[in-house]
Amino acid sequence: KGVIDALSLPEGIFCDIVPTGSAAGTLSDEICEELSIQPCAVTAVAGHDTQCAMVAVPTEKDDFIFLSCGTWSLLGTELSEPLINEKTLRCNVTNEGGYGGKASFLKNIIGLWLIQETRRQWQKEGDSLSFAEMETLARNVKPFSCFIDPDAPDFVAAGNIPERIRAYCRRTGQYVPESKGEILRCIYESLAMKYRYAAEQIEFCTGKEYDTIYIV
């Protein structure tokens, strides 16, 4: 409500916020007829695929780190209430509403977008590699030759990611990857290092140590 008031927006255009698991009603007759189904109850879910995936984390522990790894990667933990202070501001960590009134305390990171765009570029050049083939290429080259910051502005827009990676490495005085395997290895290892850095920021902000990361 404070944000709505600060922006001078009419409150009436927004829906009510309801707890996850709340009964939302029953499917209308029109929808049931269209889908050829019987009337059924509708329940409010967590409202976002990442939050829904978090519910499925196979642990009963309170302290864990989750990694939702898709086009974007979201890495964080679950807290009983939002954590907002100078540390979280400095680390650019966000709080999102989660299941059961809890807060998802997480970092947004560019994820497999880099792999997807790299594959798309090579397809344009006439080389249609499967993701499995790309993984094999990455496994067969020397590790830790060069790194990028996946969140650098260089890699946000669609386009020729392999060439941008080479330009980034050249500009930062690193080994410049040439082969497809080297490009892919650079992406995978850079993402892994970014995840480690994000996990350390989560620990810094919460004052806790986490011994498990769940990929959801």
Short names for language-model regions:
Residues 1, 5-6, 29-212:
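Active-site core segments that coordinate phosphate-bearing ligands/cofactors
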